[in-house]
Amino acid sequence: MSEVLRPSYVRQAFERLAVGRPTRLLVFIDDMDGLRKVPENIPNREGTSFHLGEPVSRIPDPFGDCHPSFSEHMLSLLGKFLAPVEIEYELIKSTEMYGSGAFDEALKLILARHQQIIEIIAPTLREENRAGLSPIMPVCPQCGQINSTLVTAYNPDRAMVEFSCERKFGGAHPCGFKGEQTVLGGKAKVGWKVDWALRWYALKVDYELYGKDLIDSARLSGQILKVLGGKPPIGFPFEMFLDEEGHKVSKSVGRGVTVDQWTRYAPIEVLKYFLLLNPRRARKLFLEAIPQYVDDYLDALRAYAAAAEEDRVSHPIDLVIQSTTPRRFDTELTFGMIMNLVSALGTSDRELIWNYLTGYDPKIASNPETERMGKVLMESALNFYADFIEPNKQRYLPQAAEREQLRALVEFLAANMGASAEEIEKKIYDLGRENYDKPGKIFPLLYRVLLGQERGPRLGAFIKLATPERMVEILNGSLES
């Protein structure tokens, strides 16, 4: 998704600066590429392995008969992923571009200048991989594979190549066919090192974003494009996403976060904002980190709403807001506080939770946009609690010395139901100083008893949110166990 969202931000910014200049956001689908490896996260891996080397647009859908091909199945998922983010884009399929002849003129040029292109690519390959190097990959008319073909002669005057189906590459199983074939009309495609240059030339691309692992590929593609007589687009390399262990997120093994998962635990605008910020810094992207990203977004949304109208257009939030997006959140409540409230109450009763939230800060229901955002966050918190917190929640049985500390807090709260968050926080610190060498050591005890977890929020504000009455109930329940 980042490969589509991030260029859309550049496009929006450009259109604001160059009013009236038409732009196109192209999403290119490499559905004519040969399958080199069976992904680990798909069904029917054995059946799919028989089609290694074939264009993915010709491989049966491993997920069943819901789509005519593997590529169409994945394309349907892309459409589903992009639907919630309100991006205007043009979908371009490799198979259609080659098959319709849209790439034919560029292919003729590549064929005519194949030797110059080979001389650019060859130094980037190991010596043993240079034999048979060709910018053109014919589709074998006998077995339908593309990874197995090896060009043996070029005939640019007739837009033809001679080739044999004998190369064992990327799992391909060559059939041994030998013959001559046109490179036009979908009968061939270019190799992956020439892909970008072909597209940039044929589609007149001005701007391209890519991961930092493709910096060398972009540089190489620019050199090839110059051979074709084109001008390389402006490039923008971005950093990779990391999982919670700091490893690069891999699509092939299914690591990462899907859009469906994200929207279960957070508004889609939070994802858009996350992808907008710091694209040249590696950032961790995993489900358990979402609550912090939500609060980062809410802070930015408050700043956006507080800005003068003429200044909002330059605020990052303005690029991610959608037609249905609340444009304000007039409360200091955080997603973390809402999640901790849900955890402490241990209920999915929406009305009860909402009453607690409005009781703590009536501003959450002060206007339709803030209220709508608040209820979206409440639903997200309930989902996150059910999936991540509740399954790991353990009831803590306090020791004798700890029980005395809890009784002291119960007595204070029972006698001071109207105490402020600051007064409650001070009492907790006083108890910490009385019982530990460092006052902060009391907090893990209270988090275990009140929330069933090791860490948590500032307790003064949280106890005010969840109400001293409810906290006394939980503390007494722990003391009676």
Describe each model-derived feature in a short phrase.
Residues 1-118, 221-222, 228:
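N-terminal Rossmann-like or analogous alpha/beta NTP/dinucleotide-binding catalytic cores
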Residues 2, 66-70, 94-98, 131, ...:
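Conserved aromatic-histidine-acidic binding/catalytic patches
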Residues 14-18, 82-89, 114-121, 147, ...:
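A generic secondary-structure signal for well-formed alpha-helical elements
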Residues 17, 24-26, 118, 126, ...:
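Basic, alpha-helical terminal appendages of large translation-related enzymes
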Residues 87-91, 95-253, 259:
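Active-site cores that bind ATP or allylic diphosphates and position pyrophosphate for catalysis
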Residues 89, 202, 304, 311-326, ...:
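Short amphipathic alpha-helical segments and their helix-coil junctions
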Residues 110, 267, 446:
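Residue-level signal for inorganic ion chemistry
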Residues 213, 218, 228, 238-383, ...:
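Catalytic adenosine-cofactor/nucleotide-binding cores of aminoacyl-tRNA synthetases and other
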